[in-house]
Amino acid sequence: MNFNHLSKDDLTHFTAMNPQSSMGSVISAHHLQRIHRMVETRSSGTILTGGEPLKGRSSLDGFNFSRGSFYPPTVIEDVSLEDDLWKEEVFGPVVVLRKFEVRAEIFVYVYTLIYFV
């Protein structure tokens, strides 16, 4: 799967109350901080899109993002297998990508995980 073509323009974030919305708020301000801390403190990887809590107003309906806990869909490539983003559940709109040279490497790695994600 190739995520390199994604851009912020492809991803629409708004309130769950608007039927045209593609995404709503995360569960709480505390959880928003947890998601952002995991993204910020990663030891490797390049953010392709997202990576910062949403600020300002929605282009769809003018909703003020400060009235909720909004984190955009975030895609990060080349994340180290030792990074917490691989080892822990983010429970948020974050996808981490890693290229494996040989298919067998994937299975060896997956079986070392605490969670099968």
Describe every region a protein language model picked out.
Residues 1-114:
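NAD(P)-dependent aldehyde/semialdehyde dehydrogenase
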